[in-house]
């Protein structure tokens, strides 16, 4: 019964030309940007901090890491040198700022190079020399 009523209503609207905009109309949809690194970002945050934006890691090392994706001071120094945007380690407790830094470095690679991005995020620019970054990549793959 309901189906017949809906069908009749649709036919009436079509005949009254209320069912669609005139042909010279334009419909604009909000632009949703596509970020090929979003899943990689989420996986790295899970491995690095279990998603905790207030995490402090690597306390056993000379240089600690901070925030949801565990950013080190040396990374922030390089980010400032490249972009002119100066963040402190405490800024990395803000997930939006940490994500901004992470995504900047992702753009140095093509979207298909998740392994290289992940390993360099973990091991720095000489990640290829560090076997530990292979183990890190294996953890990331499980989260993707």
Regions flagged by a language model, labelled:
Residues 3, 9-30:
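Bacterial Sec-dependent signal peptides at the C-terminal "C-region" and cleavage site
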Residues 22-144:
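Catalytic glycan-binding domains that act on GlcNAc-containing polysaccharides
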Residues 2-3, 114:
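Structural motif marking the loop-to-transmembrane transition
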């Amino acid at each position: 019964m309901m189906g017949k009523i809906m069908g009749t209503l649709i036919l009436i609207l079509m005949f009254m030309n209320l069912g669609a905009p005139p042909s010279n109309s334009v419909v604009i949809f909000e632009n949703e940007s596509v970020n090929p690194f979003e899943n990689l970002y989420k996986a790295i945050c899970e491995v690095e901090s279990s998603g905790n934006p207030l995490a402090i890691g690597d306390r056993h090392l000379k240089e600690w890491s901070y925030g949801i994706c565990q950013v080190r001071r040396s990374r922030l120094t390089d980010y400032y040198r490249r972009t002119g945007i100066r963040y402190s380690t405490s800024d990395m407790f803000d997930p939006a700022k940490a994500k901004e830094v992470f995504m900047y470095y992702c753009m140095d690679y093509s979207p298909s190079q998740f392994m290289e991005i992940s390993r360099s995020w973990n091991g720095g620019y000489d990640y290829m020399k560090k076997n530990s970054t292979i183990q890190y990549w294996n953890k990331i793959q499980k989260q993707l």
